[in-house]
Design a protein with these regions (language model features):
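Non-ligating segments of multi-cofactor redox enzymes
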Residues: 1-422
Length: 422
């Protein structure tokens, strides 16, 4: 019993933190502040919050300040968040206890966490931050998104990085926290910078009768400045390559959530899954290869034609008064918008497949798409004595109401990305 009490005193706060963060990630907070709770967890990370805003070049709201306390704490107390509150760190530590024989391996691996963190900071200045998806709070949040209902291969894929980290922690204990985690690396860099500012005079002393004597403070400074140099040099190269790639369209286009665009999603999306969890109609899914490598696991919208077991009697589309997905993005990949702004912001355009349409192909009366369209974007034109649907491109917003309601099997009207509509 005494051993249990000692473990509880030592790790009680960490257990509470894991439970609280898991409840936030699962969206089990009270309804009145569920959206705010969903966005809070990833926004506690300055890598996602502050440097995401830097890359976006815009103010994303007062929630940006949620990332400041961790930097302040790191400046004065170092990596205290890692050892006391980080849910990924605690779970990785527990996984590492399964393999006490693997602890020696971690000493042979160079520490890359500071380099990863500085990559993110420097490349954010280029507007194309790298390794955002390695943020531990993002990984933790994404894992719990996988448990939304219904569970599918697509929804589960967003949590794969969590499994990878846990397996790595079990095989090589301490590898993730000590060598790879960029949030830990950022705290380490801030701590070393603070030591550099507080360095005592004469910390670096030259012995007249021999070589220079380096104290621990000067060694820490040398390590810090060396990592900064490596990160800046590599980031300039990779960031420049990212800027060049931003103007290159690769792979097919896909439907994106409101306020999104291809370049912004590819540059800023951390794959945290918040937008997928926030969508009340379960229309947002991780990209499993539709848009190429750079869009992998970023959010795409799927309507009836891409969702199996769709119930055509279910009122399920991108509702004109819903902007929840844009309110929970921690990096600014999805700009926060109002309902009024959404009305002027099409995400795609419907296209009638005339060879499958009951009216066009068979001359049968059917005006379901016209009846269900909330934007009145479907016009009926008389052809051979039958009213046939035609899309008004100036009114269509690509909400998917027509696609979901179409009685055809296969569906005779689908929403396409704007860039692919002829």
């Amino acid at each position: 019993m005494s051993a249990v009490l000692r473990w509880g005193r030592r790790h009680g706060l960490r257990v509470v933190a894991v439970v609280v963060f898991a409840l936030l990630a699962l969206g089990l907070a009270p309804e009145s502040w569920r959206a705010a709770g969903a966005a809070t967890l990833p926004r506690l990370s300055p890598l996602l919050n502050l440097f995401g805003a830097l890359a976006a070049r815009e103010w994303v709201g007062w929630t940006i300040l949620l990332g400041v306390p961790l930097l302040v704490v790191s400046f004065f107390w170092g990596r205290v968040f890692c050892w006391r509150l980080c849910p990924m760190g605690f779970l990785a530590e527990l996984a590492g206890k399964l393999n006490p024989w693997g602890r020696g391996w971690v000493q042979r691996v160079p520490a890359l966490n500071e380099v990863f963190a500085l990559f993110i900071v420097v490349t954010a200045a280029f507007g194309y931050p790298l390794f955002l998806w390695l943020d531990p709070l993002c990984i933790f949040n994404g894992f719990f998104v996988a448990w939304r209902t219904p569970l599918t291969v697509a929804s589960a894929s967003i949590g794969t990085m969590f499994v990878v980290v846990m397996v790595l922690a079990a095989l090589v204990p301490n590898m993730w926290c000590h060598k790879l985690c960029p949030l830990g690396g950022l705290q380490q860099a801030v701590m070393e910078f603070a030591r550099w500012l507080r360095r005592p005079r004469g910390a670096r002393v030259r012995n007249e009768e021999g070589p220079q004597v380096l104290t621990a403070a000067s060694t820490s400074r040398r390590s810090f400045l060396g990592n900064v140099g490596i990160a800046i040099g590599t980031s300039i190269t990779l960031g420049g390559a990212g800027l060049a790639l931003k103007g290159t369209k690769r792979g097919a286009q896909a439907l994106r959530p409101p306020s999104a665009d291809v370049e912004r999603i590819n540059a800023l999306c951390a794959r945290c899954g918040n937008c997928m969890k926030a969508c009340p109609y379960e229309l947002i899914h991780p990209d499993l290869g539709e848009t190429g490598f750079d869009g992998f696991l970023s959010p795409v919208i799927h309507f009836r034609s891409k969702i199996p077991n769709w119930d055509p009697d279910e009122d399920r589309y991108c509702f004109q008064d819903c902007v929840k997905c844009t309110q929970v993005c921690p990096t600014g990949a999805l700009r926060p918008i109002t309902v009024e702004q959404k009305h002027a912001m099409p995400i795609g355009r419907a296209e009638v497949l005339k060879d499958k349409c009951l009216a066009w192909a068979k001359g049968e009366y059917c005006a379901v798409c016209d009846e269900y369209c909330p934007y009145k974007a479907v016009k009926l034109e008389k052809r051979n004595g039958v009213n046939c649907p035609v899309i008004d491109p100036d009114k269509c917003r690509g909400c998917g109401a027509c696609e979901g309601a179409c009685p055809g099997d296969p569906v005779a009207i689908i929403v396409r990305p704007l860039s692919s509509v002829v």
